[in-house]
Amino acid sequence: MKTILVTGGAGYIGSHTILELLKEGSEECEVLILDDFSNSNPLIINKLNKMVNNVKVYARDCRDTIDDILTNHKIDGVIHFAASKAVGESVNNPLEYYDNNINSLLNILDACKRFDIRSLVFSSSCSLYGDVDKLPVNEDTELSDPQSPYAYTKLVGERIISDFCNSNSNISVVSLRYFNPVGAHESGEIGEYPITKPNNILPVICNSADTGEEMVVFGDTYDTRDGSCIRDYVHVSDIARAHVDSLNYMSSNVGICDVINLGSGDGVSVLELIKTFEEVNGVNINYKISDAREGDIVQIYSDSSKAKKLLGWETKYDIKDMVSSAWKWHKNL
């Protein structure tokens, strides 16, 4: 039986990845969750335990020592999600973001080296690309000067990993640059569960559909087909599956250090997303147009051909699946 350590495993993408890890049967895999629940909801653990077996939880900050855990378990691979992730919050609390996101990664890399853990998947972000002139973006697209402390922690994290791999050739690392994960598990049992007021687009839309509260669309005069920002939305279950694919890829490719985009390859505007949500779910969204928000990227979408080539990964779910699953989850809350 393989044992996988998932840091931040109670979070949005982490919890869906755990379901993917245990999808083929819990007799083949044991999952250890390392999470301090600072930005995740403990209720997710209850839901996971109802859906799968072989999940153990350690309520621990990733910056603290985990030697006792690693001594008691032979870890075959690590998926490192644990990080602070709100762009706006990072601007207001930059030192907290640098401390948490960088030091937790350093601690995990040090543990991998000392305990001979040879596979690591790192949660990175498309925010590293910023505004680009040529679309779609691939892994060779020049990275921008990060627009937020959050994005900068991901850029520094990737550089730290590159240096680490250069000096530890027996350890493989794949950094996955997510585009815009949305949606929820098809069961409706888990999904995005913000512990404060939602900031991400689909939870905000769901909240508006549920309560009638007016949501804000920031800008409708951008140089796009309808004036609103365009993003590459990808179903969270597709994102989750890529982490399992990455572990499988590293099991037969020792000493690699790769960066891989995860996106659908299709750009969808904010207004198109709202319209699709309304049509698929039979609801009306109360929204208003506000001024454009400083720092927002106008449009971005991914070339994910490298993911298909190396991991055999491609998206299974479309935008209709994303909005329907998100609404199903929201109604179950």
Where are the predicted features?
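N-terminal Rossmann-like NAD(P)+-binding domain of SDR-like oxidoreductases, especially those catalyzing
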Residues: 1-184
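Short, solvent-exposed loop/helix junctions and linker helices
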Residues: 7, 99-102, 195-199, 233-236, ...
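C-terminal substrate-binding subdomain of Rossmann-fold SDR/epimerase-dehydratase oxidoreductases
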Residues: 20, 207-333
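Alpha-helix initiation/capping motif
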Residues: 68, 130, 142-150, 194-198, ...
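A conserved pocket-lining segment of Rossmann-fold NAD(P)-dependent short-chain dehydrogenase/reductase
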Residues: 90, 142-143, 180-234, 261
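Generic recognition of well-ordered alpha-helical segments
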Residues: 107-110, 155, 159, 203, ...
